Design a protein with these regions (language model features):
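Tandem repeat scaffolds
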Residues: 1-175
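Long, ordered, amphipathic alpha-helical scaffolds
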Residues: 159-229
Length: 229
């Protein structure tokens, strides 16, 4: 295990493998892990990150396995973007300021079939995975999306993070619920129309402006039999 404390990282790479690292109070500035045509999938495994900060960073088309991230803050306005990644035994805890997990591979010059191959691969990958992500001890002040991960593979705090099934949406008039401007209805609409999996996890924001409203909406979903605490 290689230890880095207070280091600053920048730059971009494709088709890389990062393993057996411990990073404490490090800063990542405009870092990008990409996958150019012809390069293998990126691998990020057995890594511990504590107290990191990121500015305009992204990870695309990576297998992220046995990784823990505790407290992640953003230095600019952009979240950490994750494009077309697969997760296995990844734990987020503490304050995770902004992270966007996208189902799309997000590569403008990727071959036309890249998304199709990713989608079928993701379904197969998660069908044999025990669990993908643990967010039970995490707070998300800026919000987070988990559309790219099947809800039943996410370990969560049922008081702040609920699971919604595709079947639950289908048998309900969920659009009639008062979403109070939270945009949770947009997340559900995207899941219903574009999601790969049968369930998704919704997490309330911890920011003071949104926490109570998000919590109330998630309770309404549960009371209506759409969400499961």
């Amino acid at each position: 295990m290689f230890l880095f404390v207070g280091e600053r990282f920048w730059g971009r790479a494709s088709g890389v493998t990062y393993t057996d690292l411990s990073l404490i109070d490090c800063e990542f500035n405009s870092c990008g892990v990409e996958r150019d045509t012809g390069d293998p999938r990126n691998h990020i495994e057995r890594i511990s990150v504590m107290g990191a900060a990121q500015l305009n960073c992204s990870i695309a088309d990576a297998l992220i396995r046995d990784v823990t991230i505790q407290d992640l803050r953003k230095l600019g306005s952009a979240p950490l973007f994750l494009w077309g990644c697969l997760f296995e035994r990844v734990t987020l805890s503490g304050r995770i300021s902004a992270i966007k997990i996208n189902q799309t591979v997000g590569l403008p010059n990727a071959p036309a079939d890249r998304q199709r191959v990713h989608n079928s691969g993701a379904i197969e990958f998660y069908s044999s995975s025990d669990w993908a992500l643990d967010i039970s001890q995490a707070e998300f002040p800026g919000g987070v999306t988990f559309d790219a991960i099947p809800g039943d593979k996410v370990r969560r705090d049922p008081d702040r993070q609920v699971i919604v099934s595709r079947a639950g949406l289908a048998r309900s008039d969920w659009r009639a619920i008062d979403f109070d401007g939270t945009a949770i209805d947009y997340a559900l609409s995207w899941f219903e129309q574009e999601g790969l999996f049968d369930s998704v996890v919704l997490a309330e924001r911890s920011d003071r402006k949104w926490a109570k409203r998000d919590h109330a909406v998630l309770r309404r979903l549960c009371d209506a039999g759409i969400g499961l605490a």
